[in-house]
Amino acid sequence: MILIDKIVFGKYTIVVRNKREDIAMLIQFSVSNFLSFNEQETFSMIAGKARKNIDRVFSNKKIKLTKCEVILGANASGKSNLVSAFQFAQSVIVDGLPRGFSNKFFRLNPENKTVPSEFEIELLCCSKIF
C-alpha cells in the first residue's frame, strides 16, 4: 500500500502521517460532459462483499476500499479519457482552470456546449471522508 505524506489542493496542504488511521485514499471519482463522457461515469474504489483476498482491502470503521484497481476495456472505450479526466481535475485543483478548457465538453451532443463539465472527487483522509 502506498502511503501519502501530503496532499496539496491549491494553497491548502494536508499533511498525512504514515499511520494506518492517517492514510489518504481515493474513494471514488465521477466525471460528466468531458471528452467522451456524456452522462456521469464513476470510478469507484469501494470494495465489494467478497471474503477472499481480504489483504487487498483497506478497511476502517467507516468504509472498505480496494488497495488497487485496474481499468480494462475495448479500444476506444474511454480508458485514456478517464486518465485525462483525473489529470484535468488534478490540474484544476492545483493550478486553477487552464486556458482553453472550454473545448473539452462531450461534442456529440451540441447542447453540451452550454452545460458545465462536472468532476466529483471523494477522498478518505485522516479517517474522515471528504
What kind of region is each of these model predictions?
Residues 64, 69-70, 74, 83-130:
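Conserved P-loop NTP-binding catalytic core
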Residues 1-2, 6, 11-17, 21:
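Short, positively charged and aromatic/hydrophobic N-terminal segments
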Residues 17-87:
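Pre-Walker A-like glycine/lysine-rich segment at the N-terminus of P-loop NTPase domains
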